[in-house]
Amino acid sequence: MTVGQISSAQGGTDTAKAADRPAAANRPRISMNARRQRAFYMFTSPWIIGFLLLTIAPMAYALWLSFTTFDGISPHWRYVGLDNYRELLSDSVTWDALGRTGLFAITSVPLSIIGGLGLAVLVNRPLKARGLFRTLLYLPAVVPPVGAGIAFKQLFDTNSGATNGALNIFGFDALGWLADPYARYVLLMVVLWGAGNIMIISLAGLQDVPRELHEAARIDGASAWRTFRSITVPLLSPVLLFQTVTGVIASVQTIMPLLLSADATTAGVTAIPQSNYQYMMHVFAQYFAVGRYGYASALLWVLFVLILVATGLIFRFSSGVVFYNVDPEAKK
Amino acid sequence: MPSHAGAPPSRRRFLALSAGGAVAGAAALSGCAMQVSSGVSGSGETVTLMINPDDLTPELIKQAQKDLGVKIRTVKYDITKLIAMLTNGNPPDLVRGIGAVDAAYFAARDVAEELDPYFARSSILRLDDLDPVNDLWRYDGRTQGKGPRYGMAKDFSQDSMYWYNTALFDKTGVDYPSETEPVTYEEWLDNAERLVQRKNGQTTVFGGSYNGLGKAILLTSLTAAAGGNLFTDDFSQVDFSSPEARKALGWYIDYCRVRVGPSIIDPDPNTWDGPTYQANRMAMSNCGYWLGGLINTAPKLAEVSRLAPAPVFEGGPRISTCQGGTGLWMPRKARNKDAAWRVFEWFFGEAPAKARASGGWGIPTLKSLRSLMPAQEEHQKQVLKVQEAELKHFSVASFTPYAKWEGLESIFNQIAPAAMRGDMSVDTLARRLNSAMNEQLKRGKEQVG
């Protein structure tokens, strides 16, 4: 390539650059704020699409099913309006299951929060091998629920379980732990056994409590209990509120009774001891054992509304007792 | 206001786009989901079987693919998956089912294909070679056992018979049951009470287990054994208050109440009798001939195991029902019906059928395969002798097409434990079962039309 050619080529490039300039200048400038918004939507869109596809769409489908007699098989189903909801109101099995579920929630949620908080307080102290204790106490929380169910079934089996073996050693007769009336206690034990999750969250909350406040209280002569009640608990109250809300939601949707049942099949699940026949078990049975997809969908929608109401009530009644370190109204 | 090129979408627009994307994604997923039986160019068609993993070995499948020129894909049997596939319009080509309780249910809902034209031209599954048990898969729109065939049983047993462990009988000094004359149900329970072994509130050896293949079909069979019918003639109602059904129900509640074997109030963690019987912890097990498949694999257990005729009720007829007749049916919307039929013939008449027959896992459903039933060992000869004599009393207890058996069982499981614990009389239980089950049957009849 000669010097002249190079010069000509360069001149051409310059000409092209010059021609591009006005186009680039005409392009609308994207503000930083707009860029941020675009990035926000790009990053959140997978979740939003997933939410629409895997949550909203099935919920809408279930809502539609709840107005029909669809049984999953027959093409002869029909639209029945609110009949399934009307039937639900007079179905004693549904109400009994709902009552048991409510009782389970108001028993298991406070017990697991108190238990988890108690463990957190213990492992927050300057103990030797504190890390080991924390690991051991948290370990049950990472056991998959199916594994926990199998382990508890083996442990509490009437004829070969270790629990009855221990009772026999102390001269007591074996008990039918996995049948009524004891099955509810085994269920509660499984839930409390997994309180490590609550312990970890409470522990994080405890470590956020300013040390100076405790020291000031000690100098003022406050007892340990008084310090815990008047300083630790109020500062932990947002964490406790979170645990209460998530705990209630999880407890009313628990499928642990299924995992504790002797026969976790479509028909077997209906043989769960009455005391553990909770709302979700009833939903499962109506869907898959009875084949009433319409009615079971109505049951699920009612549960969804009840959970919304319960959550709202918890927030409403907690507003006077939950202490926020940062004023939640500040940004309004 | 027109939006600027390059400007971020408004929140509303973004949500609308996301919803559009979700709908498009759903449509795409729906198109991709459960693609079954698509033609495979150059290597035959694909047939999807929804079965249990132990229904077919991988070696048999490989051999069949080679012999039939059909690609076989298996999907584990799962009722929720089946419903999803049926709803989606892409059902498996062949589905596992229990003839006694599923055949009429699916046929009445128009989802099962009539197989009579296929049987008519088959040289492998000849109508004159079919055992009468296959009539469980017939339904004429009203009654099971008549009308077109919708499936076929892979093997069967007379499920009211029972196995017993002679070593445990010897230990407690209880006489062995006769090989030819049935005991009464009352005697069976009496024997179970003598055979049960307990220590510190724990049952170390169950006297006997009597739970049938499911409570709904068990109670249907027991009522038939008492000389009656659990269902009304049109199968639209149950009647537990009839003397025969009341007798059957009372006996089963007594069985649970005396706690000689597993029940809802005394669950066996093994969920079925096999492992417990195999561990010499069960003196009598209400399993039919098919349990021999398991027993034959343990020579020591086989030596002390005997099969006994189905019990009878005092004054009742001598019948011996089949409560299962598990096999395959073809969904009406199956894509590759002809290829599926080739697999059907192979499954019921060729290598898999021969393997099942010679393994002792049930009586073959083709008469021509009976000669393959195991009879080499002494105990096998005894079992075969008792079984052959029992076939004279073979019977079928027809089941309603208007409810799923699991649905009726769920009602029983919810109401009956109170009676088993003695907190409710059998008459009250019968009334409550009538009320709850008849409501479910009424809904089913309305659905089927």
Task: Go through each PLM region and give its residues.
Chain B
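Conserved N-terminal structural module of periplasmic/extracytoplasmic solute-binding proteins
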Residues: 1-111, 121-127, 177, 314-316, ...
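Extracytoplasmic/periplasmic substrate-recognition and gating elements
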Residues: 66, 87, 250, 254-260, ...
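Short helix-initiation/N-cap motifs at beta->coil->alpha
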Residues: 75-84, 182-187, 264-278
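Hinge/lid segment of periplasmic solute-binding proteins
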Residues: 102-159, 308
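Short, solvent-exposed loop/beta-turn-alpha elements that line the ligand-binding surface or hinge
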Residues: 116-131, 178-181, 199-200, 204-209, ...
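Extracytoplasmic/periplasmic solute-binding protein
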Residues: 141-155, 160, 186-238, 282
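Long, aromatic- and glycine/proline-rich binding clefts that accommodate carbohydrate-like moieties
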Residues: 144, 308-309, 358-414, 418, ...
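Glycine-centered hinge/linker elements that transmit conformational signals in sensory
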Residues: 190-194, 234-266, 310
